[in-house]
Amino acid sequence: MTILVTGGAGYIGSHTCIELLSAGHDIVVVDNLCNSSKKAIDAVKKVSGKDFPFYVCDILDRDALSSVFDKHKIDAVIHFAGLKAVGESVEKPLEYYHNNMTGTFTLLDVMRSHGVFSIVFSSSATVYGSPKTVPIKEDFPLSTTNPYGTTKLMLERVLTDVQFADKRFSVVLLRYFNPIGAHKSGTLGEDPKGIPNNLLPYVAQVAVGRLEKVHVFGDKYPTKDGTGVRDYIHVVDLALGHVKAVEKKAGNPGVYIYNLGTGHGYSVIEIIKAFSKACGKELPYVIDPPRAGDIAV
């Protein structure tokens, strides 16, 4: 298959590109590079030993996106492109709703006009809000605690409605937890612009001296040590999940929903202690107030 990967220069997107190429698929990548870098694309080409088309393209730009579809016979789309920081979404809700929602509307419109009806959507476990029990199953009640999560939940509904109206569509909704890790080659990993939003790259930057200490947001949650607990899944496992989803469901009309995680959570303090042990030195941290939109588990 030839698969369009939106947001393919991002952390999860770039690792998925490698696994798609390894599985024998052709890829076309678009990314506006607002929170990623072309270095990731170069790394994918180096690791895979394969070349592929890459376009600096914003999915909000219908003409530019349509031009990509005109140039390539796309069989399916894996859709990562979007703004993704929980805290920032609370501060900039309008930007998140506009970018994530309108961008996906534009993508779906262009897909339909070019006869492409298979999409794997990068959703999130944030659509479950603050669950009463864990581990979380796909049939749990849905709710959100921040604008980022709300965009994911709303887009799940949009995609479901689109498939209900047009039975040619195959929609896979992948609700995943917290990706961590890097490609075994060491040439590709999570490399955020500016201060990291995710825990692992933040801890890593403290370990190498780029940042002074880890900021732990909240220690009064109803968890084992009072800090937030998250399910961490290796990014390559997550990437392989996307490959399997597009291989199994592309061309099979319907809506398919899958959680992607390990089923086991670790607290922020546990992560810091484990990282400290691995690097052979204690990493300093400070307790800060909880961030708006964060949950315990």
Where are these regions (language model features)?
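N-terminal Rossmann-like NAD(P)+-binding domain of SDR-like oxidoreductases, especially those catalyzing
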Residues: M1-A182
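Short alpha-helical functional segments enriched in proximate histidine and acidic residues
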Residues: E19, A23, V110, V206, ...
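Short acidic-hydrophobic sequence patches enriched in Asp/Glu that either
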Residues: N32, S36, D191-L199
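Residue-level signal for the nucleotide or nucleotide-sugar donor/cofactor binding architecture
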Residues: L60, E91, N99-T102, N146, ...
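Aromatic/hydrophobic pocket-lining residues that form π-stacking "cages" and hydrophobic walls in ligand
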Residues: L107, L159, V203, G241, ...
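Glycine-rich "substrate-gating" loop/helix at the edge of Rossmann-like oxidoreductase active sites
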Residues: T145, I180-P196, A204-Q205, K220-V236, ...
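C-terminal substrate-binding subdomain of Rossmann-fold SDR/epimerase-dehydratase oxidoreductases
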Residues: V208-V297
